[in-house]
C-alpha cells in the first residue's frame, strides 16, 4: 500500500507525466473493446475516447441502446471475457478493488444514478487522486427516445442512425446488432398473403412429401392458419355440406334441387380430394386450359376424361397408427373417412349403392366418383395394423387389352360348353340305327354321356401341376389342339370305341380348361371388374351350350362333331396374342417379364409399380411359409378353410342336379309328356341359361357374390320341389295334361336361378379365395372334385330315376340345395371389390381389429 500511495502522491505535481500512460491505456482499451464487439456480432456506432476526456468516457462506457444486446446472457467481467485486459491497474495495483464491469443497460436501471459497482470504482479512483471526473450532461429520463430512435432508423433507411451518431460523439461507445431486414420483409409479406396465394402455394409446391408426417404437417398448417371451411370450399367439399360457402352459392344460383345435385356431382368429380396436392394441381391446370362454354355432352366427356387420366395416379401412402403424432392427426383421418363414407365412396358396393340412392346420385356417375376419390381402407402387414390412404386406380377400367385377354380365354369356355351339351342332342340321332352305321346300346349311350366328367376328373388332377410349371396361359393354349383332335375322332368314328376315345380326350381338356381359365382371369383382371370379366367364361360356356342345342336340331351327331372341331381354331389364334399372368412370372423370379405383362394389361401410361411390389410381397410371404410337399400344405389349418369353402361350393353346384338336367333335357321332357317339342325345349333352356349369365355379369359387382348365391339357392329349391311334385302326380296316375307347361316353366326358372349364382360363382371364387402359394394344387383338387361329382350325378341319374322315380331324384336335389343355402349363409365370405391380397389375408386370419379410424361406420347423411 505504501508504494502505491507514494506513486499517487507524486501524481499531483506531475499530472502530465501520469496523464500520458492513462491516455495510451484508454486508447488500447477502446481498440480492444471495439474488436471484441465486432467478434460478438456488433458494430461500433461511435467512439470518441481521447486523452482530453478520459474521465468523461471511462465512467460512461455503457451501451447506447440496450435492446440489441442479449438480455439472458450472464454478466461477466471484462477480465473473464478478455483475460489479457486489466483496465483498472493502469495507475494503481489495487488487489482488493473490483474491476470495471461492462453490461447492457436494463430497463429497471435508474438512468440518473450510476450502478453501485461503478460508484465504488469511482470512489476508489477519487481517493487515489488518479482520476479527475468531469460531469456529463444529464442523461435521458426514460428509454422511450431510444426505442423511438431505433424504429425511425428502420423506417427512414439509416438517416436517423446517422443523426444518432452525431449526437453520440464525445459521449460514449455503443454496439448494436445488425437488423435482419429479410425477416421483417418476410413477416410483412406473410401478413399480406391472401388465402388464395397460400392455397396455390400449397398445391404448387414441387417437393410435396410422400411421407405421411410431412403431408399431415402441411395440412395442419393450412387448417391452423386459414379458415377451414374457406379452404374446403375452394379445394373440395366440406364435411358440413350446407355450411360450405361454395355450395351455398350453388344452391342460390340453381333453379332446382336437381340442378344443384348435378352441379355438385360435377364439382366433386373434377375437384376431387387428394392428400397429394400435385394431383389437384394437375387437374386445375387442365381445367384452366379447357373451354368453359361447351355443351352438356362435352362437359360430361371432359368430366370423365379428367377422372380417367392415367397420369393422375398417386402412389399409396402408408400410415402406421403408432406414428400419428397427436390426437388431432387421428381426428383428421377419422373426420376425413366419415366424410368419404358419407359421400358414397365405400369399398362395399352394396353400401355404396344405398348411399348413392340416398344422395340421389344414381348409377350415371356414381361409379366414376367412387373410383376418382381416395378413401382410407384397412390393411395389415406382418401382423401390424396399418391404414392405407388409398386412391383406387384412375385407369380406364375396361382397357381393351384386358377385355381381349378375357375374351380370348372365354372362347375356350365356349368349346367346353359345346362339349358338355353335346350328348343331349347327339344321343337322339346316335341311337337311331337309320342314321348310324354302328349300334349304340343304352349302356354305351350312358357311357358317352358319363365318360366326359370322368376324364374331366383326370384333367383337373393333371391341370394343377401344369399351371404351376408351364404357366396359366401355356396350359390353356395346350388344350386347343387336343380339342380339335377329339372332335375329329368323334366325327369320323366307325364304332363306339372311337366316340368314347374322343369324348375322353375332350373331357380331359375340359378338366384342364375348367381349372386354368378362372385362375388366369383372377390373376390378370383388376379387382373393380374382376366379377364382370370373370363371368365371361361362364357366359361363353352358355353360348356354347345354346349353339349346340340349336345346331343339334338340324344336324346329326357326326356333323355336330365337325362343327365342334372348328370352334377351337379362333381360340388357338387369340391365345397367342395375350401374355402370361404377372403373378406367375413373379413366382418364377422373372420381374421384368411381370412388369411388361402388367403394362400390357393395364395400359402403357399406367403406374404398375405399386401392383408389382404387392405381387412380390405376396410371393415372398408365400415362399417363407411354403414347404417342400405341396400336398401337405393343403392340410395346414390356415389353408383348410379356403379349400373347404371351394370344395363345398363345387359340391352344392353339382348336387343341385344341373348336369343331369343339361345332359338329359330332351329325355326329361319326353318323360314329362310335355306338349312342347323336346328340341324346342332345349333351345329355350339354352337361351335362358345364356341370358341369365349376362344378368349375373351385370349384378355381380353391384349386388355381391353372396346375394346372388342366396337368390340362386331359393330359386332352385322352389323349382325342384315343384318339379318333383309334378312327376309325383304323374306317377300316381293323376291327369297332368292341363299343366303340360309346368315342366318347361320350372326348368326355365331353375336354369335362371342356377346361372345367376351357383353356376358361375364357385368357379369365380375358386380363383379368388385360394391362397397364392397353393392356388395351383388347391384349384386342381377343387376341379377334380367338381368333375367327380359331375360324373356321379350324370352316371347315376338314370339309376336314381329307376330306384326312386323322377320325383324322388328332384326332391333329393332340392333338399341338397336347401342345405347349401345355410352353407352360404354361415361359411362363404364376400369377396366383392377386394384385392386377392386382402382376401388371402382375411382367409389366413391375419387381419386384426383396427382402431376406430379403420373400423368407423358411416354416419347418417342428409342433404
Swiss-Prot record:
Q: Which GO terms describe its molecular function?
A: sugar transmembrane transporter activity; trehalose transmembrane transporter activity
- The disulfide bonds in this chain are none
Here the segments flagged for biased composition (Low complexity) are 72-85
Q: Mind telling me what this protein is named? A: Facilitated trehalose transporter Tret1
Q: Which UniProt keywords apply?
A: Cell membrane, Glycoprotein, Membrane, Phosphoprotein, Sugar transport, Transmembrane, Transmembrane helix, Transport
An annotated GO BP: trehalose transport
> Where is the sequence biased in composition, kind Polar residues?
47-59, 114-129, 177-187, 336-347
Functional note = Low-capacity facilitative transporter for trehalose. Does not transport maltose, sucrose or lactose. Mediates the bidirectional transfer of trehalose. Responsible for the transport of trehalose synthesized in the fat body and the incorporation of trehalose into other tissues that require a carbon source, thereby regulating trehalose levels in the hemolymph.
Question: Which residues are exposed on the Extracellular face of the membrane?
Answer: 420-446, 501-503, 552-558, 664-679, 728-746, 795-807
Q: State the residue spans of region: Disordered.
A: 1-208, 286-307, 332-354
- Phosphoserine modification sites? 254-256, 326, 328, 851-852
Q: What is the lineage of its organism?
A: Eukaryota, Metazoa, Ecdysozoa, Arthropoda, Hexapoda
Organism field:
Drosophila mojavensis (Fruit fly)
- Membrane side Cytoplasmic: which residues? 1-398, 468-479, 525-530, 580-642, 701-706, 768-773, 829-863
Oxidoreductase as a keyword of this entry, yes or no, is no
Going by the UniProt annotation, this protein carries glycans at 434
Q: Which residues cross the membrane?
A: 399-419, 447-467, 480-500, 504-524, 531-551, 559-579, 643-663, 680-700, 707-727, 747-767, 774-794, 808-828
Segments of skewed composition (Basic and acidic residues): 28-46
* InterPro entries, A to Z: MFS_dom, MFS_ERD6/Tret1-like, MFS_sugar_transport-like, MFS_trans_sf, MFS_Trehalose_Transporter, Sugar/inositol_transpt, Sugar_transporter_CS
Amino acid at each position: 500500500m505504501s508504494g502505491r500511495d507514494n506513486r499517487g502522491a507524486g501524481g499531483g505535481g506531475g499530472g502530465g507525466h501520469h496523464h500520458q500512460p492513462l491516455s495510451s491505456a484508454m486508447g488500447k482499451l477502446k481498440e480492444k473493446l471495439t474488436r471484441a464487439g465486432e467478434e460478438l456480432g456488433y458494430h461500433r456506432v461511435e467512439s470518441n475516447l481521447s486523452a482530453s476526456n478520459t474521465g468523461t468516457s471511462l465512467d460512461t462506457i455503457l451501451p447506447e441502446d440496450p435492446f440489441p444486446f442479449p438480455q439472458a446472457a450472464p454478466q461477466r467481467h471484462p477480465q473473464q471475457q478478455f483475460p489479457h485486459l486489466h483496465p483498472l491497474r493502469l495507475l494503481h495495483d489495487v488487489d482488493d478493488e473490483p474491476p470495471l464491469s461492462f453490461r447492457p443497460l436494463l430497463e429497471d436501471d435508474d438512468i440518473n444514478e450510476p450502478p453501485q459497482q461503478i460508484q465504488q470504482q469511482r470512489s476508489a479512483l477519487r481517493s487515489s487522486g488518479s482520476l479527475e471526473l468531469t460531469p456529463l450532461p444529464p442523461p435521458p429520463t426514460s428509454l422511450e427516445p431510444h426505442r423511438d430512435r431505433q424504429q425511425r432508423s428502420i423506417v427512414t433507411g439509416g438517416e436517423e442512425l446517422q443523426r444518432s451518431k452525431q449526437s453520440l460523439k464525445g459521449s460514449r461507445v455503443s454496439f448494436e446488432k445488425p437488423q435482419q431486414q429479410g425477416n421483417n420483409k418476410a413477416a410483412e409479406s406473410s401478413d399480406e398473403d391472401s388465402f388464395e396465394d397460400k392455397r396455390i402455394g400449397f398445391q404448387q409446391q414441387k417437393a410435396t412429401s410422400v411421407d405421411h408426417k410431412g403431408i399431415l404437417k402441411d395440412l395442419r398448417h393450412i387448417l391452423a392458419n386459414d379458415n377451414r371451411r374457406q379452404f374446403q370450399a375452394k379445394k373440395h367439399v366440406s364435411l358440413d355440406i350446407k355450411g360450405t360457402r361454395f355450395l351455398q352459392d350453388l344452391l342460390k344460383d340453381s333453379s332446382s334441387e336437381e340442378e344443384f345435385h348435378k352441379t355438385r356431382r360435377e364439382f366433386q368429380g373434377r375437384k376431387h380430394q387428394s392428400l397429394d396436392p400435385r394431383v389437384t394441381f394437375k387437374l386445375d391446370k387442365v381445367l384452366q386450359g379447357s373451354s368453359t362454354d361447351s355443351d352438356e355432352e362435352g362437359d360430361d366427356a371432359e368430366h370423365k376424361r379428367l377422372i380417367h387420366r392415367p397420369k393422375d395416379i398417386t402412389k399409396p401412402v402408408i400410415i402406421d397408427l403408432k406414428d400419428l403424432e397427436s390426437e388431432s392427426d387421428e381426428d383428421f383421418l377419422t373426420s376425413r373417412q366419415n366424410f368419404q363414407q358419407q359421400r358414397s365412396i365405400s369399398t362395399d358396393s352394396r353400401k355404396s349403392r344405398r348411399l348413392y340412392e340416398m344422395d340421389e346420385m344414381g348409377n350415371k356417375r356414381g361409379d366414376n366418383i367412387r373410383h376418382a376419390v381416395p378413401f382410407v381402407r384397412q390393411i395389415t402387414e406382418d401382423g401390424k395394423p396399418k391404414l392405407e390412404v388409398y386412391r383406387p386406380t384412375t385407369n380406364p377400367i375396361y382397357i381393351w387389352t384386358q377385355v381381349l385377354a378375357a375374351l380370348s380365354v372365354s372362347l375356350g369356355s365356349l368349346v367346353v360348353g359345346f362339349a358338355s351339351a353335346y350328348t343331349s342332342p347327339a344321343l337322339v340321332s346316335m341311337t337311331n340305327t337309320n342314321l348310324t352305321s354302328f349300334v349304340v346300346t343304352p349302356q354305351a349311350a350312358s357311357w358317352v354321356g358319363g365318360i366326359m366328367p370322368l376324364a374331366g376328373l383326370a384333367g383337373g388332377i393333371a391341370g394343377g401341376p401344369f399351371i404351376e410349371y408351364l404357366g396359366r396361359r401355356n396350359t390353356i393354349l395346350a388344350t386347343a389342339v387336343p380339342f380339335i383332335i377329339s372332335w375329329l375322332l368323334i366325327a369320323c368314328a366307325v364304332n363306339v370305341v372311337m366316340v368314347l376315345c374322343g369324348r375322353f380326350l375332350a373331357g380331359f381338356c375340359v378338366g384342364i380348361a375348367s381349372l386354368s381359365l378362372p385362375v388366369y382371369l383372377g390373376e390378370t383382371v383388376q379387382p373393380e371388374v374382376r366379377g364382370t370379366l370373370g363371368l365371361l367364361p361362364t357366359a361363353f360356356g352358355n353360348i356354347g351350350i345354346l349353339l349346340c342345342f340349336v345346331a343339334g336340331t338340324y344336324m346329326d351327331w357326326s356333323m355336330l362333331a365337325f362343327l365342334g372341331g372348328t370352334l377351337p381354331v379362333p381360340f388357338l389364334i387369340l391365345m397367342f396374342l395375350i401374355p402370361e399372368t404377372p403373378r406367375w412370372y413373379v413366382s418364377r423370379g422373372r420381374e421384368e417379364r411381370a412388369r411388361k405383362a402388367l403394362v400390357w394389361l393395364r395400359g402403357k401410361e399406367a403406374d404398375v409399380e405399386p401392383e408389382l411390389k404387392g405381387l412380390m410381397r405376396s410371393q415372398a410371404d408365400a415362399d417363407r411359409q411354403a414347404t417342400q410337399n405341396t400336398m401337405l400344405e393343403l392340410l395346414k389349418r390356415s389353408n383348410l378353410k379356403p379349400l373347404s369353402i371351394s370344395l363345398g361350393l363345387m359340391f352344392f353346384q353339382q348336387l343341385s342336379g344341373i348336369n343331369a338336367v343339361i345332359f338329359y333335357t330332351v329325355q326329361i321332357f319326353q318323360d314329362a309328356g310335355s306338349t312342347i317339342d323336346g328340341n324346342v325345349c332345349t333351345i329355350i333352356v339354352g337361351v335362358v341359361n345364356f341370358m341369365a349369365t349376362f344378368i349375373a355379369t351385370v349384378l355381380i359387382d353391384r349386388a355381391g357374390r353372396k346375394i346372388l348365391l342366396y337368390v340362386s339357392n331359393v330359386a332352385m329349391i322352389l323349382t325342384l320341389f315343384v318339379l318333383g311334385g309334378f312327376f309325383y302326380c304323374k306317377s300316381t296316375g293323376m291327369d297332368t295334361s292341363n299343366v303340360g307347361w309346368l315342366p318347361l316353366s320350372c326348368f326355365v326358372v331353375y336354369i335362371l336361378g342356377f346361372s345367376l349364382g351357383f353356376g358361375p360363382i364357385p368357379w369365380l371364387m375358386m380363383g379368388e379365395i385360394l391362397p397364392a402359394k397353393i392356388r395351383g394344387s388347391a384349384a386342381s383338387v377343387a376341379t377334380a372334385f367338381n368333375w367327380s361329382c359331375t360324373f356321379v350325378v350324370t352316371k347315376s341319374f338314370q339309376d336314381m330315376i329307376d330306384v326312386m322315380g323322377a320325383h324322388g331324384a328332384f326332391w333329393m336335389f332340392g333338399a341338397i340345395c336347401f342345405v347349401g343355402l345355410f352353407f352360404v349363409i354361415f361359411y362363404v365370405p364376400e369377396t366383392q371389390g377386394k384385392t386377392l391380397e386382402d382376401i388371402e389375408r382375411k382367409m389366413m386370419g391375419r387381419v386384426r381389429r383396427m382402431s376406430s379410424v379403420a373400423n368407423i361406420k358411416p354416419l347418417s347423411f342428409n342433404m
